[in-house]
Amino acid sequence: LSDFDGRTSKLSEYTGNGNWTLVMIWSSTCGTCRREAPRIEAFHQRHANAGVEVLGISVDSLEGVMNARRFVRQNRLTFPNLVGDPEDVALLYLDTTGTHLLGTPGFLLFNPRGRLRTFGVGPVDVGRLDRIVGEISLVR
């Protein structure tokens, strides 16, 4: 994984830091990703000051970073985004969840200690995520 300027990064840099972390795995050519991006941005805005972080990971690879940048700009995403090769991101998903990434968007939700709480592929139930981070944040 790397940022859009090519600096290497790791998922572990964004998880286990005392905050909930929602990861959205996306592709600039994915129609469902385009529909989900504004919903995830709204989730990010709602929880920005409540111990919840959002991270995007594009599978457009470094060669497609211009498409990834355009996707972020067009969807007005204010949360950090990384880019990775599709195979590397799929392996990361498999290592993290024990299941294959069957498409995009993919979602991973980590608790404040960095443990995977829930995951899935396809449209996400943002209301469910709101409830999960809301309930547990009270106990933080």
Say what each PLM segment does.
Residues 1-3, 25, 109:
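Hydrophobic beta-strand positions
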Residues 1-2, 136-140:
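Non-globular targeting/processing and membrane-anchoring segments
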Residues 1-21, 46:
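A short beta-strand-turn-helix
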Residues 18-21, 26-29, 61, 103:
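Short pre-active-site segment immediately N-terminal to redox-active cysteine/selenocysteine motifs
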Residues 34-76, 86-94:
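Structural microenvironment flanking redox-active thiols in thiol-disulfide oxidoreductases
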Residues 75-77, 85-134:
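Thiol/disulfide oxidoreductase modules built on the thioredoxin-like
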